Amino acid sequence: KEIEDQGGRAVVNFSSVADFGAAQDMVNQAVEELGGLDIVVNNAGILRDVIFHKMTEDDWDSVISVHLKGSFNVSRAAATVFREQESGSFVHMTSTSGLIGNFGQANYAAAKLGIAGLSKSIALDMGRFNVRSNCISPFAWSRMIGTIPIGDDAQRARVEKLKTMTTAKIAPVAVALSVPDSKVTGQIFGVRNNEIFLMGQSRPTRSVHRGEGWTPETVLEHAIPSMEAGFYPLDRSQDVFSWDPI
């Protein structure tokens, strides 16, 4: 209704993105009722936060199904349309929980890091058809974030900071990545209130070699010590983004 009130056209679909057939129906509905499809924003998500040794199979499956499988399902359905028209843009939602890390979110982190890999693969596979794919790692208060359990004062303070960051701050970046004039593809952007970050992607940072090869002993005696200065600490997202939102 809000879209229509501002002069746009909108249709609603209440099916689950975790269902491959339902995702295809969503794409078909968009094409039939709106006259085409140019942009896909994979935004569906749920949380089932729990410390790893207490995580159930259902905790794992439900989060992976909505986030990672859901992103695949909708993207795969749209890929056929994009390929035929030789244009289109995907914007996927990843998270610093996967890119950096967080407590009690093994399911969510795995799904979100998987989405970053999915987006890069789509960018590589579909670039020949003038189709682009990027990720946004959003910092924003939403209904999903509102389900995070508050266990102590530190978590409560973090949640209060999150409440100051609205989804309206994310939308301009999603739109900018989707317009025809944009040539950006295969990238990951963090959006935190009025800040935009280009997030790094995995590349080698140090290397060692040994002409005669390695044994477990020489790995421990030589390889590990020579690379140890470059090890990443067990940071959480809030350790890296430790300042108040700007």
Predicted regions and their residues:
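A glycine-rich helix->loop->beta "capping" turn
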Residues: 6-9, 29-42, 48, 87, ...
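The beta1-alpha1 cofactor-binding region of Rossmann-like NAD(H)/NADP(H)-dependent oxidoreductases
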Residues: 14-25, 57
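Active-site helix of classical SDR
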Residues: 75, 111, 119
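Active-site-adjacent segment of SDR/Rossmann-fold oxidoreductases
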Residues: 81-84, 100, 116, 121-131, ...
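Residue(s) in the substrate-gating loop at a strand-loop-helix junction
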Residues: 95
